[in-house]
A protein has these predicted regions:
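A conserved beta-strand-loop-helix scaffold within acyl/acetyltransferase catalytic domains
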Residues: 39-49, 58-68, 131
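Conserved acetyl-CoA-binding loop-helix of GNAT-fold acetyltransferases
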Residues: 81-97, 117
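Conserved acetyl-CoA-binding loop of GNAT-fold acetyltransferases
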Residues: 119-130
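C-terminal "cap" of GNAT-fold acetyltransferases
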Residues: 133-149
């Protein structure tokens, strides 16, 4: 049995909940996981390679879990990135230790400057490159290795 970070629970998502979250949280950074519509978002949310940690402050999504790697997305209800730095690090440490990950990556729209600075300066992600013509324009790919957290 895998133990979760103490402040989280695994999110449960049915069709109605997925549609509600898609509508309610459209403005949250990273919430839509690079998906173009609610149908695509729903497929990601119920995929066996996705783990969604839910808490009172928001969500942490680990998607594309395979071969010791995953893509991580953070969505905070209050939008206060710096308030959640330690919780974000704890979730990443949990995924690396309990899920056996050695690398997590984040894909962030290039226009989200504050989110990119937070990932790099506070969490420790390293910028790897630009994904051109990603879902809605260019995106930045960042990564964090187990020994860097």
């Amino acid at each position: 049995m895998i133990s979760l970070p103490h402040f989280t629970r695994v999110g449960q998502f049915d069709g109605a909940r997925i549609r509600g979250l898609w509508s309610m949280c459209a403005s949250l950074p990273s919430f839509r996981l690079g998906c173009k519509d609610v149908s695509e978002f729903g497929k990601v949310m119920v995929d066996e390679q996705t783990i969604a940690l839910e808490s009172d402050w928001g969500w942490v999504f680990f998607t594309n879990l395979q071969n010791g790697r995953a893509t991580v997305s953070f969505s905070f209800i209050d939008g206060q990135l710096s308030e959640h730095t330690e919780m974000a690090k704890e979730c990443i440490r949990w995924a690396m230790d309990d899920l056996g990950l050695h690398r997590v990556q984040a894909i962030v729209p290039s226009s989200w400057k504050a989110y990119l600075r937070w990932l790099e300066d506070k969490i420790g992600f390293k910028r790897e490159g630009i994904l051109r013509q990603w879902t809605n324009g260019n995106a930045v790919m960042l990564s964090l290795l187990k020994e860097e957290i």
